[in-house]
């Protein structure tokens, strides 16, 4: 039952923080989410990519081209892992700096969320109470009909359906009325929350700290680019044998086709 109330609350509270509004645990940091996603994605690409390379090399075309992709796959995977290791610390430093610079803003927003939560909690409690009462009333009305069905014959199914339909419709109507009432009560607080968030962001936009942050972000991105250059060069060098094999196979195929045409 609590899940129903929490779901309804989320429907009426806007903003990216709404999904953490009722959470007791600390949300995962942006860096952790990005790092986990990148790791899973790259590992999946690496594993599935090797499978595709194996299938290609065992095919008729792969045997004819003889690119020897698998011979270079491990070195390429090692180069990609090295690239991740070199870029990782710089990226983590960037996210850590971002979280540190916005700690004050996040504290103020959390304070606003807590204040709004306290104001809307009575309405949520009332909604839960009325919903539970309606569900219990519906259960009491349906229970005798279930007993009647068990004791009756199959032909009474249609009669039971006719009796249940009005009760189900009544429950839906009452639930809809409760939701409408809850929406009416929560609307002012939802507007208040949006206004507070807009004010916080406007204050951040007008403050000098935003310009400082933009400069620092540019600096971090430049450092990230410099860190990535050696690893990207290693990746390019690792791809050269594959490209060279591909070029040789292409020209070999062209020469063979030319010879066949001239002999005909």
UniProtKB/Swiss-Prot annotation:
It is found in: Secreted. SUPFAM superfamilies: Apolipoprotein A-I. InterPro entries: ApoA_E (IPR000074), Apolipoprotein_A1/A4/E (IPR050163). Residues 67-264 are annotated as: 10 X approximate tandem repeats. GO terms for cellular component: chylomicron; extracellular vesicle; high-density lipoprotein particle; low-density lipoprotein particle; very-low-density lipoprotein particle. Its main location: secreted. Pfam families: Apolipoprotein. Participates in the reverse transport of cholesterol from tissues to the liver for excretion by promoting cholesterol efflux from tissues and by acting as a cofactor for the lecithin cholesterol acyltransferase (LCAT). As part of the SPAP complex, activates spermatozoa motility. One of its GO terms (biological process) is phospholipid efflux. One of its GO terms (molecular function) is cholesterol transfer activity. The modification Methionine sulfoxide is found at residue 109. Disulfide bonds: none annotated. Residues 1-18 form the signal peptide. Homodimer. Interacts with APOA1BP and CLU. Component of a sperm activating protein complex (SPAP), consisting of APOA1, an immunoglobulin heavy chain, an immunoglobulin light chain and albumin. Interacts with NDRG1. Interacts with SCGB3A2. Interacts with NAXE and YJEFN3. This is Apolipoprotein A-I. Sequence repeats lie at residues 67-88, 89-110, 111-121, 122-143, 144-165, 166-187, 188-207, 208-229, 230-240, 241-264. It comes from Marmota marmota marmota.
């Amino acid at each position: 039952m609590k899940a129903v109330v929490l779901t309804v609350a989320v429907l009426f509270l806007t903003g990216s923080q709404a999904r953490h509004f009722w959470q007791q645990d600390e949300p995962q940091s942006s860096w952790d989410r990005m790092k986990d996603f990148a790791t899973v994605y790259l590992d999946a690409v690496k594993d599935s990519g090797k499978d595709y390379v194996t299938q290609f090399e065992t095919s008729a075309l792969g045997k004819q081209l003889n690119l020897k992709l698998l011979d270079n796959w491990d070195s390429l995977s090692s180069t990609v892992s090295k690239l991740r290791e070199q870029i990782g610390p710089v990226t983590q430093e960037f996210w850590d700096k971002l979280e540190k610079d916005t700690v004050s803003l996040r504290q103020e927003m959390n304070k606003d969320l807590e204040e709004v939560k306290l104001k809307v909690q009575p309405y949520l409690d009332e909604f839960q109470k009325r919903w539970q009462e309606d569900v219990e009333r519906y259960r009491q009305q349906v229970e005798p009909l279930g007993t009647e069905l068990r004791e009756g014959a199959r032909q009474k199914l249609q009669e039971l359906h006719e009796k249940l339909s009005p009760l189900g419709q009544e429950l839906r109507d009452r639930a809809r009325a409760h939701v409408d009432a809850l929406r009416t009560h929560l609307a002012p607080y939802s507007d208040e929350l949006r206004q507070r968030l807009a004010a916080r962001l406007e204050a951040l936009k007008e403050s000098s700290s935003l310009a400082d942050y933009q400069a620092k972000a540019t600096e971090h991105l430049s450092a990230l680019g410099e860190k990535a250059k050696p690893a990207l060069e290693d990746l390019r060098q690792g791809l050269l044998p594959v490209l060279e094999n591909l070029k040789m196979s292409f020209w070999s195929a062209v020469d063979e086709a030319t010879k066949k045409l001239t002999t005909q």
